[in-house]
Structure formats: C-alpha cells, structure tokens
C-alpha cells in the first residue's frame, strides 16, 4: 500500500513540471515508473496470485499437442483443462508460449506489466489534455491494485484500450476484431462493444433524465430481479457459481 501511495505522490510532484516541457517525456517517465511497480512485485502479491502461478506451472507442463487439444472452439467458453486452470483460450496460449520460451511465472508478470503500462500511457497521451493527471487519477483510484489482482481482466482491458481509436475513426469491423481478441483473455470485455453504438448517440437533457430514472428504478428493483439476471448473464460465461444473493435487510 505504501508503494502505491509513493507512486502517486511522485507523479503528482514531477508530473506537472515535466509535462509543461514535454508531455511525451512525462508520460514515458510515468510509464517506466508504473512498469517497475507492476513488474517487480512479489509473485505471491495479489488475492489470486497462487492460482495464476499454479496455473502457469500446470500449463507449462503440457505438450504442444495437449495444449492445442485443450483449446475450446467456442470463444465464449473456457479451455478444456482441469478446474481452476480452465482459463480462456488466449490466456492458456500466452502462458504456454512464455513457458516454452523459458520464462518463469515472474516473466509472465513482467510481460503483463509492460503491456498494461504501455496501454495506459498510450491511451492517456492520445486522448487526454493532461495525460500526467489522467495517470495520477489511475494511480489513486485502485486501478493499479486491479492490475495486480485480476490479471486476465487487466490484459483484456489493455487490449481494448488500443481499440478505442477505431471508435473514433468509425471502423466497426476493426473495433470488433479488437474486442474478439480481448475476449480471448476475458470474456466480460464483450460489454465494451456497447461503446461503439453509444458513442454515436447524441446525449440530451431528456435522454439523461430517462437514463437517471431508469437507473433509480433498476436500483429499487435490484434486490428482486438482480439475482436471476446475474445468473443468466454469468451463465453465458460459465460462471453461474459467482451469482450473488441479494435480499432486503
């Protein structure tokens, strides 16, 4: 926790100073800082670290034919591996490739740190007027802990961020290809596909009012309908067991 606080403090100190001279230099420095923070953490750091590490060792023990045979042709389903290690196809392939190249689990962490830090910095530099402040906000709103804790979701998010340019340029096919690639690491990113049609919707006060009313109604009904809705949604991803139970106190 102290490391995360120091990281945010350093960005706040040198960010505005360096950015006033060169935004690219500033983002590069912050990117290196984020990379080191994510890459040099202990393998055991994070709530799911043991499962990911054990999964890496298990996948690394597979032969090429075994790994290939375990892949599921259905992108919305997991690879056909034993429970706890039956990750998405892309995650299985990535783990196997890095292990085959001689990298340990720490090598996977370093690879993910590089992709994550570069993706966040690329996104901030391209779409933010003050990229250092965007990265500062990212560092203070639990995104780094998110990046450390849930590796597959973070990789899927990082890939998705590269696809935003296709929303801006109005290239739906390329955008969906990026979404499909990201889904190979975590299927929940399919929800991000909604951003393309939403980005073309002009917001008015009336629409915002309707959205607010719908949100209030949804919150009021959530205790009654959310458990069943969650079961249906999570069922699509093979995660029915994660459905929560809601009740009024």
What are these regions (language model features)?
Residues 111-114, 132-161, 185-188:
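Membrane-embedded helix bundles of polyisoprenyl
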Residues 5, 175-178, 188-199:
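Transmembrane-embedded, aromatic-rich helix segments that form part
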Residues 1-34:
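Start-transfer (signal-anchor) and selected internal transmembrane alpha helices
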Residues 50, 54-58, 68-103:
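Short hydrophobic/aromatic helix or loop-helix immediately within or flanking a transmembrane segment
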